[in-house]
Amino acid sequence: IMTEEGGMTYSGAGVDIEAESSAVASLISSLANSTRKKGTRGAPVDLQGGFGGLIEFGSNWLALATDGVGSKLQIANSLSRYEGVGMDCVAMNVNDLLCVGAEPLAFVDYIAVPTPSNETHSRIGKSLTEACMRANVTLAGGETATLPGIVTELDLSGTALGWLPAGKAIAGSDIRPGDVLIGFPSSGIHSNGFSLVRKVVSKSGMSLTEPCPVSPEHESRSVEFD
């Protein structure tokens, strides 16, 4: 977010974080009585600040996360470039499980389109498959919906399932001075903040088909693990 005077912000790009948070709070308050009794299989586990939802499952907990690629898809749609969006979708979900200490196990996708396309679906499918292989999760299924009266462009989201031993969730409450923090270099902005990115591109007069004004080849562009 640009904070200098005259700069651009998320709200200026059409994303009101406070309004979104308020809407989410209203949704959650309406769901308060929809859960199973504590101590039974499937009952919710209270985890403040977590991006994944936890439920009881015997001596273990199951973790669920759902997310989409966001407005980055508008760039992919305009360029007909879908090779990486499956990777984005899987990563957004499994990362939300990992940050609470859960091991991702399986993933399902949801694709909404105004008109189905064999070529587009094939490219997305290959991207999802590669992403699931890298994340070591099972691509368990999904749903494709043709919704010409609702969507005008392809939309992609997914849900990931993971597990962890009961009571072993990471919430940050056990962090103490002197603990070792491990940081990984980012290979880019991934799937967050693209409403602002598109606004910057539009205001600058640049085109998505022009050469990148900064070097796209950075040492942190790709991280390999043994």
What are these regions (language model features)?
Residues 2-226:
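Helix-biased detector of long, well-ordered alpha-helical tracts
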